[in-house]
Curated annotation (Swiss-Prot):
<keyword id="KW-0665">Pyrimidine biosynthesis</keyword>
<feature type="binding site">
    <location>
        <position position="45"/>
    </location>
    <ligand>
        <name>substrate</name>
    </ligand>
</feature>
<comment type="subunit">
    <text>Heterotetramer of 2 PyrK and 2 PyrD type B subunits.</text>
</comment>
<feature type="binding site">
    <location>
        <position position="125"/>
    </location>
    <ligand>
        <name>FMN</name>
    </ligand>
</feature>
<dbReference type="GO" id="GO:0005737">
    <property type="term" value="C:cytoplasm"/>
</dbReference>
<feature type="binding site">
    <location>
        <begin position="239"/>
        <end position="240"/>
    </location>
    <ligand>
        <name>FMN</name>
    </ligand>
</feature>
<feature type="binding site">
    <location>
        <begin position="45"/>
        <end position="46"/>
    </location>
    <ligand>
        <name>FMN</name>
    </ligand>
</feature>
<dbReference type="GO" id="GO:0004589">
    <property type="term" value="F:dihydroorotate dehydrogenase (NAD+) activity"/>
</dbReference>
<keyword id="KW-0285">Flavoprotein</keyword>
<feature type="binding site">
    <location>
        <position position="125"/>
    </location>
    <ligand>
        <name>substrate</name>
    </ligand>
</feature>
<dbReference type="GO" id="GO:0002058">
    <property type="term" value="F:uracil binding"/>
</dbReference>
<protein>
    <recommendedName>
        <fullName>Dihydroorotate dehydrogenase B (NAD(+)), catalytic subunit</fullName>
        <ecNumber>1.3.1.14</ecNumber>
    </recommendedName>
</protein>
<feature type="binding site">
    <location>
        <position position="213"/>
    </location>
    <ligand>
        <name>FMN</name>
    </ligand>
</feature>
<feature type="binding site">
    <location>
        <begin position="261"/>
        <end position="262"/>
    </location>
    <ligand>
        <name>FMN</name>
    </ligand>
</feature>
<dbReference type="GO" id="GO:0050661">
    <property type="term" value="F:NADP binding"/>
</dbReference>
<dbReference type="InterPro" id="IPR001295">
    <property type="entry name" value="Dihydroorotate_DH_CS"/>
</dbReference>
<feature type="binding site">
    <location>
        <begin position="69"/>
        <end position="73"/>
    </location>
    <ligand>
        <name>substrate</name>
    </ligand>
</feature>
Length: 300
């Protein structure tokens, strides 16, 4: 039997599958449930300094087997999130705190809180594509990205992950600006829109949102490949992973672990155990003894 354990920035995972930020991760008990169903770690919902209601419905629209969402970074605020982290930590598995802000000082304050609450790492949401003043507007500015990452690394002791956007002209430039991060998370959603041709208007209240799911997988695989080849840094791949083949593609492109989100909506929590079982069979058949044996093997 193959060894499915892996590590990212020194954090050991029993398998390479993590829950991505944005689904079943605002509540400690749902995070526990996901880990009990096979996820090796969870990433929390992106949390800001203050409570935020987000956009009014509709905030999600189906696009084939993918989704377009514009939830609007709704969250309870960092001071109201401590108990959810503590509950999730009962699993004994890594819990990564996702945070968003518009400036380095606020990011650092959020990171300190997540560390204080017991998070094993902090993921910087530098890439949400549908909220003004946050996410993509921050993550497309190399100087600001560098300032945020460097400040965070100097102020907290747990690993820092930088979640980067595909909606930029040069992702390598942004990755290099975030080079002091302990790992990259690639990719966030792709800016997208769906029109209701009868109503003659966008379906989402916010007009545009972020496309996730199988539709973006080739984009995610490409960026993991490019950034791994250029930087050699640990990478967590995310975007469209539904099957073991999807996960293996990301790993062969250079990811040490992957995150799963939309498949929780389209397939359900069984996606974790299904992928683990089928990946194990694949690795035995292909004579891969460990996840590390597969990481980056496709890079030329």
């Amino acid at each position: 039997m193959a060894d499915l354990s892996t590590s990212v920035a020194g954090i050991r995972l029993e398998n390479p599958l993590m829950l991505a930020s944005g689904i079943l991760d605002e509540n400690g008990y749902t995070m526990l449930d996901v880990m009990n169903n096979g996820a090796a770690a969870v990433v929390t919902k992106s949390i800001g300094m203050e409570e935020r209601n987000g956009y009014s419905a509709p905030v999600i629209v189906e696009y084939g087997d993918s989704l377009i969402n514009a939830v609007g970074l709704s969250n309870p605020g960092i001071d109201n999130f401590a108990e959810e982290i503590r509950i999730a930590k009962r699993s004994g598995k890594p819990v990564i705190g996702s945070v968003f802000a518009s400036d380095a000082e606020s990011f650092v304050n959020l990171g300190r809180k997540m560390q204080e609450y017991g998070c094993d790492a902090v993921e910087l949401n530098l890439s949400c594509p549908h909220v003004k003043g946050f996410g993509l507007e921050v993550g497309s500015d190399p100087d600001l990205v560098e300032d945020i990452v460097n400040e965070m690394k100097s102020k907290i002791s747990v690993p820092v992950f930088a979640k980067l956007s595909p909606n930029v002209s040069d992702i390598i430039e942004i990755a290099k600006a975030a080079e002091k991060a302990d790992a990259y998370v690639l990719i966030n959603t792709v800016k997208a829109m769906k029109i209701d041709i009868r109503a003659r208007m966008p379906v989402l209240t916010n007009a545009y949102g972020g496309l996730s799911g199988p539709a973006i997988k080739p984009v995610g695989v490409r960026y993991v490949y490019e950034v791994k080849k250029e930087t050699g840094k640990d990478i967590i791949g995310v975007g469209g992973i539904t099957t073991y083949e999807d996960a293996v593609e990301y790993i062969m492109a250079g990811a040490s672990a992957v995150q799963i989100g939309t498949a929780l909506y389209t397939v359900g929590k069984s996606v974790f155990r299904n992928i683990i079982s089928q990946m194990n069979t694949f690795m035995d058949d292909e004579k891969f003894h460990s996840i590390q044996d597969m990481v980056g093997v496709a890079i030329r």
